[in-house]
Each structure stands twice: as C-alpha cells, then as structure tokens.
Design a protein with these regions (language model features):
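Extended, subdomain-level signal for the structured scaffold at the beginning of enzyme domains
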Residues: 1-117
Length: 117
C-alpha cells in the first residue's frame, strides 16, 4: 500500500499582541506555512491547511521586507492564488482528523512569558 499524496499544514489560530505595547499582532508566520506548502505542491501533494479554531491571522513581522521573496509576497497577496484560497478556507483541525495524510507540518506560536510548568 502506498502512502497518500496528501499533506496537512497546521497553523495557529492565535491572535495576540506581538510586542508588549507595540500594537502589532502575532499569528501565522506566513513563510512558515507558505514555504512547505510550495514544496509539497511541487512534489505533487494535495495540501490541507487547518488550525485549532478554523481561523487565522497573519503575524505582522512575517510580512515585513526580507521575510518573503517578491514572488512569495505576490503569491500571498493574491487572494485567488491556491495558497491563499487554502489559507482562507482554513478548517478546524478536528475536521481533518480522519483524512489519511503522509506528511504533517505544525506551526505554532511562542509566548516568551508563558508558564511552562
């Protein structure tokens, strides 16, 4: 039996302040979802994107110059691109639990002051 050509990219539903008092939000670091998405698609995989709540927000810092190439930024900004349609159709992780996947990629959020006990 061969493995399914399906990948799951799990992103965060977090929407929090990036820097204390900075006014910018954290969430999905776009390159961390876009880069593997492009690799999986180029390898012929179907790709699902899911999050805890079926929602997402972009990390402000991830859209600043230097984090995405001009081509990647164009792909992200184009709401009709496959990547952006998949991001915007983001479903709850619980809704994809029964799908057979051969690759999983998780992108979370780090809270530096979180209680780690």
């Amino acid at each position: 039996m061969s493995l399914p050509r399906r990948a799951l990219i799990a992103v965060t539903s977090a929407h929090a302040e990036l820097f204390e008092g900075g006014g910018h939000t954290t969430g999905v670091f776009i390159g961390e979802a876009l880069h593997p998405y492009n690799v999986f698609k180029a390898a012929g995989f179907e790709v699902d994107i899911a999050s805890e709540e079926g929602t997402w927000t972009e990390d402000w810092l991830s859209l600043q110059p230097g984090f995405l190439s001009p081509e990647e930024r164009e792909q992200y900004d184009d709401r009709s691109s496959e990547f952006r349609r998949e991001m915007d159709a983001n479903v709850k992780a619980a809704d994809v639990l029964n799908k057979d996947v051969s690759v999983q990629r998780l992108h979370g959020i780090d809270f530096p002051h979180a209680d780690r006990d």
